[in-house]
From Swiss-Prot:
Pfam family, any one: Cytochrom_B559
Protein family membership: Belongs to the PsbE/PsbF family.
Native source organism of the sequence: Synechococcus sp. (strain RCC307)
Keywords: Electron transport, Heme, Iron, Membrane, Metal-binding, Photosynthesis, Photosystem II, Thylakoid, Transmembrane, Transmembrane helix, Transport
Cofactor note: With its partner (PsbF) binds heme. PSII binds additional chlorophylls, carotenoids and specific lipids.
Record-given protein name: Cytochrome b559 subunit alpha
SUPFAM superfamilies (alphabetical): Cytochrome b559 subunits
Assembly information from the UniProt record: Heterodimer of an alpha subunit and a beta subunit. PSII is composed of 1 copy each of membrane proteins PsbA, PsbB, PsbC, PsbD, PsbE, PsbF, PsbH, PsbI, PsbJ, PsbK, PsbL, PsbM, PsbT, PsbX, PsbY, PsbZ, Psb30/Ycf12, peripheral proteins PsbO, CyanoQ (PsbQ), PsbU, PsbV and a large number of cofactors. It forms dimeric complexes.
GO biological process: photosynthetic electron transport chain
PANTHER family linked to this entry: CYTOCHROME B559 SUBUNIT BETA-RELATED
Binding-site residues, heme: H24
Transmembrane segments: 22-36
Role, per record: This b-type cytochrome is tightly associated with the reaction center of photosystem II (PSII). PSII is a light-driven water:plastoquinone oxidoreductase that uses light energy to abstract electrons from H(2)O, generating O(2) and a proton gradient subsequently used for ATP formation. It consists of a core antenna complex that captures photons, and an electron transfer chain that converts photonic excitation into a charge separation.
Subcellular location: Cellular thylakoid membrane
Length: 83
C-alpha cells in the first residue's frame, strides 16, 4: 500500500470488475422498474397523499381558481368548492 493511501480500491478498478457488473446488472434495472411501477400504478399518489392529475380541478371548471383578495383567500376557495 502506498504512503497516504486510504486502503480503498480505485474507482476505475471497481467499475471494470465483473463482480460490479454482475451485481448492478440486476439491481439498477430492478430499481428503475420498481420506481416506474410505483408511479404508473398510482401508489405514489396514495403514499404521499397528493391528488391525482384528474382531481386537481372539478369537471365543471374551465380554468384554475384565482384568489383575488389576499386575506380572504380561504373563504374564496371554500365558496368556489361549495358550488
Amino acid at each position: 500500500m502506498a504512503a497516504g493511501s486510504t486502503g480503498e480500491r480505485p474507482f476505475f478498478e471497481i467499475i471494470t470488475s465483473i463482480r460490479y457488473w454482475v451485481i448492478h446488472a440486476v439491481t439498477l434495472p430492478a430499481i428503475f422498474l420498481a420506481g416506474f411501477l410505483f408511479v404508473s400504478t398510482g401508489l405514489a399518489y396514495d403514499a404521499f397523499g397528493t391528488p391525482r392529475p384528474d382531481s386537481y380541478f372539478q369537471a365543471a371548471d374551465v380554468k384554475a381558481p384565482v384568489v383575488s383578495q389576499r386575506y380572504e383567500g380561504k373563504s374564496q376557495l371554500d365558496t368556489r368548492l361549495k358550488n
